[in-house]
Amino acid sequence: MGEVNKDAVEKYLENNPQFAKEYFDRKMRAEVLGSIFQVSPGDVKEGVSFKDMSRLEECNILFELLTEIQDEAGSMEKIVHKTLQRLSQLLARDRCSMFICRSRNGIPEVATRLLNVTPTSKFEDNLVNPDKETVFPLDIGIAGWVAHTKKFFNIPDVKKNNHFSDYLDKKTGYTTVNMMAIPITQGKEVLAVVMALNKLNASEFSKEDEEVFKKYLNFISLVLRNHHTSYLYNIESRRSQMLLWSANKVFEELTDIERQFHKALYTIRMYLNCERYSVGLLDMTKEKEFYDEWPIRLGEAEPYKGPKTPDGREVNFYKIIDYILHGKEEIKVIPTPPADHWCLISGLPTYVAENGFICNMMNAPADEYFTFQKGPVDETGWVIKNVLSLPIVNKKEEIVGVATFYNRKDGKPFDEYDEQIIETLTQFLGWSVLNTDTYDKMNKLENRKDIAQEMLMYQTKATPTEVESILKYKEKLNVKSIEECDEKDLIRILKEELPDPKDLELYEFRFSDFPVTEHGLITCGIRLFFEINVVEKFKVPAEVLTRWMYTVRKGYRDITYHNWRHGFNVGQTMFTLLMTGRIKKYYTDLEAFAMVAAAFCHDIDHRGTNNLYQMKSAAPLAKLHGSSILERHHLEYSKTLLQDESLNIFQNLNKRQFETVLHLFEVAIIATDLALYFKKRTMFQKIVDAIEKMETEEEAIKYISIDPTKKEVIMAMMMTGCDLSAITKPWEVQSKVALMVANEFWEQGDLERTVLQQQPIPMMDRNKGDELPKLQVGFIDFVCTFVYKEFSRFHKEITPMFDGLQNNRVEWKTRADEYEEKMKVIEEQKKKEEEAAAKKAENAAGGGGGGEDGKSKTCIVL
């Protein structure tokens, strides 16, 4: 057999391709092929195509790519670069490129990331740095069109394609003939566009090339999706941390917007991913003072023609806070910044404040609209590269400031995710302004309240002259100032001016205030405190007691019934229940002191209308207090008086005693709300039942006095008894008081009819005034009888009140019956008249026009 040479073998294999394939598949060892193809990208042999590669070779390449993907240390760009190198080799194309898709200012775009990748090119040469990017909107270039349509394109001749742009060819000196382009997507979002340019040894890319291209693009897709998911995770992590920490600091500082912004922005600096950022705070003044307008109106000054915010304010940054994060961290605060400050000179913050737009600029110094400083802005040598500026908008949609962020740390321009995360931050900061605004409003309201209280005190508080009309120290002690007087002398001369309680029947349940002047009632009130022996025991200054009593009298409005006379009567009845009714034995002197004082104050500043009217009319008191509206107002008014040291009759008590007094004031005054009466009367009845079964007085005293709750229940019922006590007075007094009460109710009814456009209930309807006796009987039976009957059981000394109530019921019942009889007669008369009229009408209709007797006047029936 002859020698077989190389040429003969090669010729045989070419003529018998099926044999060659079977032989190589069966005989060629994997180690040999592996040694051929396991080479670095730089050593890849030119011209090796997918056709020339076995499955084993393909597996080796795929394994290598998977190894690169698995290596977490490798960057996304490096892995994609290696994949594109393999594709360049396999597809026999001249080069590959990758464009990254992103959005800025809400506009999508594509930017060069890997350019002109060949099987032997270096990564550093192919990677496009952020400052050298070429950016296309989606309506220019094939890459943009692919990103827009999200479709694969195989273009045999780019010059015949309407979307082709030769901008990059001119910039790089390259000539593009044909290409394949495919989008890399995640869901509906386009992440990148990969392009294969200029098929070698052919005029266009084949169907087989398309399959290979799409096949290996799965690796790039996997890498990009993994990178994008990681990036989104980082974004959300930063967003949550920013919101968490900014919320923490925002709610730490509620007093001042500058401190609030500063604390929040400084705390989250590590999550902002930028080299520097600044916050410009805008002046919130909408209207100039009138004296600032005068020069303009007189023509001495030009009106403002500069930029204004959307709500019409002049754009005026009153402060800039500059946060430097590169190099040594530093914070600069620039109050009243000049117009040529580097933060403002570009005009970008002013533009954002004027229009409220988000501005994202990738190459700021080259921008033609804004004049950014091209060189270093300060001594640190730092220069502006890219900028993201956003308005800070509060809940009223007013722009309160502008936040500007400079130079993303990785050198890339800010993208849509940076916009979103920082917009979330600025929105939160804008909304948090509500906290400081609310705090400021609360402060103003508090200050207004203090001023109003001061004005009220000035008008209500007893003047020195009024105090001197009772406490005549100048006349009797021959001094110019009360400070010169000894307290014992003041007590002595005060007692001399007070009436004798027996002369005025202050100890009697039948006491009437009608013979006494309102000024005289003030001295009577002071006398009651001396009678329960609390003035000297608790060291109440004579001047303070006199001023407080006079001020309480002035605190009552001049209305029909709930005036000072009613207030005094309730205080006198409380005194009588304690002393004459002998209930004082259950209470300490301090408690008795507080109870009488609270009784005097219980209706102070009453408006002449009830709680229901306050709610119907949406009065401020109804908004301030949810329940027992007027009673809580009387309580707050009383406490306000005690806050003034010159009116505080409890000023010499210790802290615990004073707290006890305030608590008793609350229980006593709130208890006058009749809506609470039905809740407490069962409890009071049980106490009375228990007392009746006790054999000795000492046992009863112990049963009540050691239990604060029982004492409070009794005190609450005492306040109800005092408040309604006018109905127990002698008939001559009670009938007059009842008319005053009715008149006040009718006045409220008139208001309901005219102001609220509502029909009042019968008790408040002036047109039903004749029903007053009937209403009084119903009120006595439904409310009053239980109170005084139980008190007469509780202490027989209180029986005169129950007797007075019963006598008055007889009087009202008599008048109610008379009214009923009168109404019955009227109804019967009215009924007769109606029947007569009906009969007359019937006769007229049925008589055929006859006379009154139903007979014809012209015809006689024989």
From Swiss-Prot:
Pfam families: GAF, PDEase_I. The active site is at residue 562. Its EC number is 3.1.4.35. Residues 830-862 are annotated as: Disordered. This is Cone cGMP-specific 3',5'-cyclic phosphodiesterase subunit alpha'. Composed of two alpha' subunits that are associated with 3 smaller proteins of 11, 13, and 15 kDa. Residues 486-819 form the PDEase domain. The gene is PDE6C. GO terms for cellular component: plasma membrane. A divalent metal cation 2 binds at residue 603. It comes from Gallus gallus (Chicken). Transmembrane segments: none annotated. SMART domains: GAF (SM00065), HDc (SM00471). Residues 75-224, 256-433 form the GAF domain.
